[in-house]
Structure formats: C-alpha cells, structure tokens
C-alpha cells in the first residue's frame, strides 16, 4: 500500500519516467498506466470496486494519484473496512501483473470473492493469535527413582554490581 501511495509501483508510466523506452498505455483499457489508474481509475478497477462489499463514497474530480484517492475516502468515510480496501487494491495490482506475465483474466466478482476469503482468513488467524494463553501451572513433583532434583535461583543487583546464587 505504501508503494502505491508513494507512487513507486513499477507501472508503465513510472518506468517511462525512469528512462525505459516503453509505451505507457494500460493493457486493459488503453489509458495511461499509473498507480492511480490501475488501482482506481481503470474501468476494470472501477468494476471491481463497484462489486466489492465496500460502500465507497463518490470521489469527485477523480484524482490521478492513488494517495489522493485514499485521503478522499478516509475523509469522506473514515469507518471504511480498510483491510478489505487494502487487499482489494493489492489484488488489482496482482491481477495486472498476472495479465502482464501471461496469466488469465479474472472477472470482478472472482477478485472480490478472493479478497473476502483472504481477509476472512487473515482475521481468523489474527484472532487466534490474539487470545492470551494461560501459563502452565508450575508445581513441584517428586523426581523419578534414581534421579535428583536441584532447585537453583540467581539474583543480579545492578546498583551494587553483585549477584547471589542459591542452591
């Protein structure tokens, strides 16, 4: 997301600016390919955003930079599901790359379904990680026959630059 907002995705327009002799038209619609175009302005991107479960506000004057689009949305609808938003943008970029390198075209419904599944899995994994685990109960037990237990303790005192050991 930060690459798209800083306009450093390797789009055709950015590659051309960096001196690579390349046509900078979008493979899907023929318009100039920039991050803002791929992730928002392209007809295909608009179709994906349209079928997504996000209820996005209308962004007037269609900004060219993706960061401006993100700011507009955050100001007009701060309670948006940002995880869905970010994964949708990421999926649009991945779809562009897949097409560029010989992959198959996915329709907007399929992309939004994959976005929903990805975010659902992400949330489930994070939910299971966030549950605090109870520390195991520590209780003394008699050692096995032929074994000995030794209890030890160490304390370090920084101020006096000393330590103590107990066995």
Which ranges hold each PLM region?
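Primary recognition of RNase H-like, Mg2+-dependent phosphodiesterase/nuclease domains
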Residues: 1-167
């Amino acid at each position: 997301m930060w690459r798209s907002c800083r306009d450093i995705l390797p789009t055709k327009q950015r590659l051309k600016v960096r001196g690579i002799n390349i046509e900078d038209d979008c493979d899907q619609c023929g318009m100039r390919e920039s991050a803002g175009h791929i992730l928002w302005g392209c007809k295909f991107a608009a179709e994906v955003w349209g079928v997504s479960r996000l209820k996005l506000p209308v962004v007037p004057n269609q900004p060219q930079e993706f960061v401006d689009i993100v700011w507009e949305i955050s100001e007009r609808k701060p309670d948006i599901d940002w995880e869905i938003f970010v994964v949708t943008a990421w999926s649009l970029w991945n779809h562009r790359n897949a097409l560029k390198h010989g992959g198959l075209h996915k329709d907007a419904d399929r992309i939004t379904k994959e976005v929903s599944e990805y975010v659902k899995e992400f949330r489930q994994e994070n939910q299971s990680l966030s549950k605090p685990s109870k520390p195991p109960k520590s209780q003394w037990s008699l050692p096995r026959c032929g074994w000995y237990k030794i209890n030890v303790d160490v304390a370090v005192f920084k101020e006096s630059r000393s330590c103590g050991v107990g066995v």
